[in-house]
A protein has these predicted regions:
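Acidic, low-complexity mobile loops and tails
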Residues: 1-61, 94, 98-114, 119-134
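Residue-level recognition of beta-strand microenvironments
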Residues: 22-24, 68, 85-88
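Charged, well-structured alpha/beta interaction segments
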Residues: 57-73
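Conserved "cap/hinge" positions at secondary-structure junctions
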Residues: 60, 66, 86-87, 111
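Charged, amphipathic alpha-helical coiled-coil/dimerization segments
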Residues: 79, 83-84, 90-97
Length: 134
């Protein structure tokens, strides 16, 4: 695990500039919000997520997270059909603060186009980008 400005940036993930991460697992993509995002939002109290079977589109909103500070759109890092929604996050949204990269994942999708990964950051680029965030 790499730390940049007190933010965890795990290796092996892709990152979007909308503060979401993607982990490729057996041709599927697991999606969640980054440590930076959860720290900016502070105490997350609600997550509105789409349903299994729905399709999300890269760079388009697919849900929201609500904190004591703000309501923020979730922006899809990839296009694909939703295979699984993390109901634990809907029941216990604090998981997004406590464990954003493991228990706090949001969606598991079947990506429509793996080439879209080229338009988001790999780990090395993400580390450099996180250095510019405050």
């Amino acid at each position: 695990m790499v730390k940049v400005n007190d933010v965890d940036v795990p290796e092996g993930l892709y990152y979007s500039k909308d503060y979401e991460w993607v982990k490729i697992e057996d041709g599927k993509a697991r999606i969640g919000i980054t440590d930076f995002a959860q720290k900016q939002l502070r105490e997350i109290v609600y997550a509105e997520l789409p349903s299994e079977g729905d399709t999300i589109t890269q760079n388009e909103p697919y849900g929201t997270v609500e904190s004591v500070k703000a309501v923020s759109d979730l922006i899809a890092p990839l296009t694909g059909q939703i295979e699984k929604v993390n109901s634990d996050v809907q029941n216990s949204p604090e998981l997004l603060n406590e464990d954003p990269y493991n228990k706090g994942w949001l969606l598991l999708i079947s990506p429509s186009n793996m080439d879209e990964l080229k338009s988001i950051m790999d780990h090395a680029k993400s580390v450099e980008w996180h250095k510019t965030l405050e």
